[in-house]
Amino acid sequence: MLRVTLVSRSDHTVLYLPEPRLMTGFFLSLTLMPGRASVNCQLIRKKRYPMTPDRYKKARQVLKHRQPDLTVIMENVHKPHNLAAVIRSCDAVGIGEVHAISSIKYFRMRQKAASGSGKWVNINIHRKTSDAVQQLKNEGFGVYCAHFSEDAIDFRQFDFTQKTALIFGSELEGVSDEAVGLADGNIIIPMMGMVQSLNVSVASALMLYEAQRQRELAGMYERGIIEQDVMDKVLFEWFYPDVAKYCNKHGMPYPALDEDGYMAEPLKDRTGNIRKLP
């Protein structure tokens, strides 16, 4: 069934028509004047992920399992396939927000390696390691480096049920001395071969799945600790990013979504007045 969001005024009517099988939509603006009518149709989505009621319900379930008290800091990890693989692992274990430290303004990920996970995980970019570490410590996180040292903890013995941020370093040099100095400790993956390190994407996957194992045993995936208003905001931005951008630009609240993920009300400004779209 095609759902239509209608905004009506005496001289202007706006419809938002989501295509039911793909996340594609149109803003259809009809201006009515005596003796004539003009129509302006604006395509706001060209290619998006499929949006069906089942996919919307799946997204809600995913958010209920999110682990906001577990995150990753990628320090100068620049290779696109490594970035994508780490973020894919984060999404798989329920991490919805990660941090990256780099002087490069824009990250490039290989979509094949990410398998679309970049859409579902928010990336916070920091220019300095100290900025990221201090922010997370202020939020109550314990910060630990994936780094070999004499006092490093075997990742299988580390308590991942605590509020934890893991720092993974660059492909060639690992984590920086600055990161080691700022962190609360180091965690290692025991190695029995000639080499003393794993690829960053492999190391992160091993540690994150150990974290998932511990948290699942502790029942932490059933907590549902993300507040409802935050969940509603994230869902709207996931499935209607262009409309969300329009709302943010014009200071408008997001329209409510119904149980199937369709917009259930017209767009309104902060004073409650119905707004017309360009």
Model-derived regions: residue spans:
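N-terminal, intrinsically disordered charge-dense segments
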Residues: 3-11
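Short hydrophobic targeting helices and cationic amphipathic motifs
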Residues: 12, 17, 27-28, 41-42
